[in-house]
Amino acid sequence: MSDQQQANQQDDQPFFNIQRVYLKDMSLEQPNSPGIFLESEAPSVEVQVNVGASQLQEGIFEVVVTGTVTTKVQDKVAFLVEAHQAGIFDIRNVPVEQLDPLLGIACPTILYPYLRGNIADVITRAGFQAIHLSEINFQALYEQRLQAAMEEAQGQGGDSGIVMPDGSQARH
């Protein structure tokens, strides 16, 4: 096999690389401090996690995992933390049907430990007991979102599907 053939074969191989992981945005609100520190009742905690992806240029994608933690004591907000943990990923030569799961499962799985650490750190630095977010099965979350989108498409009576990053549609 010539060097040129070998180079061409390598150029066609699927490629995945993490270019950068970074904290894109983070906010902390403590609307009822310092009085909330005197409360003795156990707080209630609500956690929301969302995933978004966008193409920055050919083969370069940004994936953002957003985590929001709202803690209340009775009806008073003790604190609200929102963090956007992002990553830039170089993804080439991946079939379009595999790209969406890669962006919706593999990339968030890489980013989530950073998000967990950043949220726990800011909560502790704010003077509260650390809240350690539990692990998330991004495969199951992705499948739930896919199922919900397909049901919504069926409910609209159209044969529309999921719009993939390249603009094509996945149909079931």
From Swiss-Prot:
InterPro entries: SecB, SecB-like_sf. Pfam families: SecB. Its main location: cytoplasm. Transmembrane segments: none annotated. The keyword Transport applies. GO terms for cellular component: cytoplasm. It is found in: Cytoplasm. Keywords: Chaperone, Cytoplasm, Protein transport, Translocation, Transport. Residues 153-172 are annotated as: Disordered. GO terms for biological process: protein folding; protein tetramerization; protein transport. Gene3D superfamilies: SecB-like. The keyword Protein transport applies. It comes from the Bacteria. One of the proteins required for the normal export of preproteins out of the cell cytoplasm. It is a molecular chaperone that binds to a subset of precursor proteins, maintaining them in a translocation-competent state. It also specifically binds to its receptor SecA. Belongs to the SecB family. HAMAP family: SecB. Homotetramer, a dimer of dimers. One homotetramer interacts with 1 SecA dimer. This is Protein-export protein SecB. It comes from Cupriavidus metallidurans (strain ATCC 43123 / DSM 2839 / NBRC 102507 / CH34). The gene is secB.
